[in-house]
Design a protein with these regions (language model features):
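A generic structural signal for well-ordered alpha-helical segments enriched in polar/charged residues
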Residues: 23-30, 34, 109
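Extracytoplasmic small-molecule ligand-binding "clamshell" domains
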Residues: 30-31, 37-58
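Contiguous mixed-secondary-structure segments that line small-molecule binding/active-site clefts
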Residues: 26, 52, 56, 64-65, ...
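Short, well-ordered coil loops that connect the C-terminus of an alpha-helix to the N-terminus
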Residues: 34-35, 117
Length: 162
């Protein structure tokens, strides 16, 4: 008997997230052989869907799994908002150390308790820095008078009206 697993993401061909999704799916196939068929929809956005739909499609059972930004769950698991704050995590190494430790385990449990999702692991989407083509940004004040695109996330948008 073959088990079918559907997995999806929202990034294009060159994205590190897409490449990581491929590695995940290929690893499952290699480790489980003919007992699994893995279908990876690499970019639902390209097909007219919104990235945030990954969660509802997984909850409904249409998908078995997906990757997504923790920002999409911050309203349901407010503790995830810690990693949405700009200038909070100084570098990747510290972020990995924190997420691979007790806090990462606690966050995974909170996600499961509040949403039913199981966290398989964490990866970075960049330390929450802000980049632009105009000037360096080192502290929040450096963003004055700039238009900045954000996710639909209160932590990202807080203060944007000042």
């Amino acid at each position: 008997m073959t088990t079918r697993l559907t997995f999806a993401g929202y990034q294009g061909e060159g994205s590190v997230h897409t490449r990581a999704g491929r590695v995940f799916c290929e690893t499952l196939k290699r480790e489980l052989g003919d007992s699994i068929q893995v279908d990876f929809d690499e970019n639902i956005v390209q097909k007219g869907h919104k990235a945030a739909e990954l969660l509802s499609r997984t909850e409904s059972g249409e998908l078995d799994g997906c990757y997504f930004s923790s920002s999409y769950l911050a309203a349901r698991v407010p503790e995830l908002g810690l990693f949405d704050q700009h200038f909070v995590v100084p570098d990747r190494q510290r972020a990995y150390a924190v997420l691979d430790g007790a806090l990462g385990k606690r966050l995974a449990q909170e996600v499961e308790d509040r949403t039913g999702f199981t966290v398989l692991g964490y990866w970075d989407n960049g330390v929450r820095n802000i980049s632009n083509a105009h000037r360096p940004i080192h502290k929040p004040h450096d963003c004055t008078d700039m238009k900045i695109r954000t996710l639909d996330n209160d932590n990202h948008q807080r203060g944007s009206d000042h």
